[in-house]
From Swiss-Prot:
This is Small ribosomal subunit protein eS26. Residues 103-119 have a biased composition (Basic and acidic residues). The gene is RPS26A. GO terms for biological process: translation. One of its GO terms (molecular function) is mRNA binding. Component of the ribosome, a large ribonucleoprotein complex responsible for the synthesis of proteins in the cell. The small ribosomal subunit (SSU) binds messenger RNAs (mRNAs) and translates the encoded message by selecting cognate aminoacyl-transfer RNA (tRNA) molecules. The large subunit (LSU) contains the ribosomal catalytic site termed the peptidyl transferase center (PTC), which catalyzes the formation of peptide bonds, thereby polymerizing the amino acids delivered by tRNAs into a polypeptide chain. Keywords: Cytoplasm, Ribonucleoprotein, Ribosomal protein. Residues 90-119 are annotated as: Disordered. GO terms for cellular component: cytosolic small ribosomal subunit. Belongs to the eukaryotic ribosomal protein eS26 family. It is found in: Cytoplasm. The keyword Ribonucleoprotein applies. Component of the small ribosomal subunit. Mature ribosomes consist of a small (40S) and a large (60S) subunit. The 40S subunit contains about 32 different proteins and 1 molecule of RNA (18S). The 60S subunit contains 45 different proteins and 3 molecules of RNA (25S, 5.8S and 5S).
Length: 119
C-alpha cells in the first residue's frame, strides 16, 4: 500500500516511543512529535494598562515581562480550528511555511508588495 507521507505524520525518526501531550481543545492524548505546536507571545499587561504602569513605575525604562505559551493541538482540532489546512497531494511535499498575511487598516498586505511600494 502506498504511503501518504514520508514522515507518517510525525517527527519521531528512530525514537521508538514519545511521551504524549494533551490537546488544548479536546484534551486528547497526542504523541508530542505528532501534535501541532504553536507558540504565543503576549504582554502580561494589556495594552490599556501599559501607560498607567509605566507612569507608576520607579524605573525609567522597565521592560514589561511577556507570557510565553506553547499550545499543543491534535490533528483533528488543528484542522477544525484552521490552524493547519488540508493540502493537495503535490502541496503536501512543500515544507516551507506559507507566506504570512499582514493586515494594515483592513487590507491584506504581502511583504513583497510592501517592499515594492517602499522602493
Amino acid at each position: 500500500m502506498p504511503k501518504k507521507r514520508a514522515s507518517n505524520g510525525r517527527n519521531k525518526k528512530g525514537r521508538g516511543h514519545v511521551k504524549p501531550v494533551r490537546c488544548l481543545n479536546c484534551a486528547r492524548c497526542v504523541p508530542k512529535d505528532k501534535a501541532i505546536k504553536r507558540v504565543t507571545i503576549r504582554n502580561m499587561v494589556e495594552a490599556a494598562a501599559v501607560r498607567d504602569l509605566s507612569e507608576a513605575s520607579v524605573y525609567a525604562e522597565y521592560a514589561l515581562p511577556k507570557l510565553y505559551n506553547k499550545l499543543h493541538y491534535c490533528v483533528s482540532c488543528a484542522i477544525h480550528a484552521r490552524i493547519v489546512r488540508v493540502r493537495s497531494r503535490t502541496d503536501r511535499k512543500i515544507r516551507t511555511p506559507p507566506q504570512r498575511k499582514r493586515f494594515t487598516s483592513d487590507r491584506k498586505v504581502s511583504p513583497q508588495d510592501a517592499a515594492k511600494k517602499a522602493n
